[in-house]
Amino acid sequence: MLLAQRIWNWCRRFRYRCGYGVHSPSDFFLITSVVYEDLPYYAYERLKMSSPSKSLPHYREKVNKLLFRLVNYFRPMSLIEVGEGNGDAFRYISNARTSMISVSLKGLEKIETLHRLEMELKRLEKVDFLHIAFTPYYKEVFELAFPYLHDESCVVVGGIYTSEERKTWW
């Protein structure tokens, strides 16, 4: 059943897979040159060789590479990752731009995470790239970080379809 659903979703999205039907030049460029880019980047091999994590298989290498390309494209000065990615996601993100301030908040209880997030947000004053990985308190994280986002900020939320509640929130 899962295979049939995946094939159906692929068929539905086939027309738009390379940006066809997208009328915004900037969105078309993002789709064709960042999302569907398949050429090797300068750091892929080095990152792949250095201790790949297998702790969370749902965060595959292709997702890590997409996060790398997004950071490489948007060139943020500050990045916050909240939640359990797989460890590799943060390595890929932080290696895409080594001069940015990178903060990872994971493996903490809800109150401690939100408190540390609030302290980091006040310290940074604005967030250019926010990665909300797999965390049960994604709503609180987004609401807390929202005032620190600006027009040029990029927000990546992982696991949107993991629950009906999360899908509705998105």
Predicted features and spans:
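A short alpha-helical cap/connector motif
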Residues: 1-129, 135-156, 160-170
